[in-house]
Amino acid sequence: MKFLTSILILLNSFLIISQENWTNLIGDDLSNWEIKQGTAEFEINDGVITGTSLLKSPSTYLGTKEFYSDFILEFEVFVEAGLNSGVQFRSLNYPDQKKSVYGYQIELEANNPERNRMWTGGIYDQSRRSIFLYPLSVNPIARSAFKVDEWNFIRLEAIGNSVRTWVNGIQCSNLIDDTSKNGFIALQIHSIGKESLQGKKVKWKNIRVLTKNLNQNRYPVEDYAPEINNIDNYLTDKQIEEGWKFIFDGISSNGWIS
């Protein structure tokens, strides 16, 4: 009985320490954030950050003043139907350009008739390669995870060259990419081209980030979320376990005969 009690005390202590290591990114005001690129407005009320879509404005970002490299990010988000949004991470600014924000983005895509992709949780490379690095076409199970006009729980793990996402507990992305290693986190209000979308809103709450003890806090990888490796001349642990190996080292002709 004493042994069981000791175990429970240790587990409770670990949970308390784990909770204490998280940093809440939403305060009483937006003093730790800054507007980037566009002119859409953000406001904070009762712990909820709300961004309002604005016609004739480029995409607008509310970015953290602090930069983050390796971290776990969790938040809840509510996207009104018809809007496209996202959260930038490890992102930077191009100097003296209108489309200044670039870097990785977690897609937040409310279902609309023109797109009908439902790729929320996928990884897009904003204003750089300008492609989906992890499209949910490779992970169809994840396409139904996001709920439009409801609060959704999002989790991002950006640790080393590994980027993984979850939407409402469903793993969406499992990406290996090393293009960006550090940068700000930013909430996006995407540009709109229709008056019917004017004034629609995206809301975020309970945004928190973990920068310590990351490996101990990682979620397990699901088999239905295939790994995509974008790094040249690099094999992941999973690929090595599957038996992949290089037949050309990228430098010499070792192992080849003429």
Listing of model-derived features with the role each one plays in the protein:
Residues 1-20:
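Bacterial Sec-dependent N-terminal signal peptides
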Residues 19-258:
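Carbohydrate-interacting regions of secretory-pathway proteins
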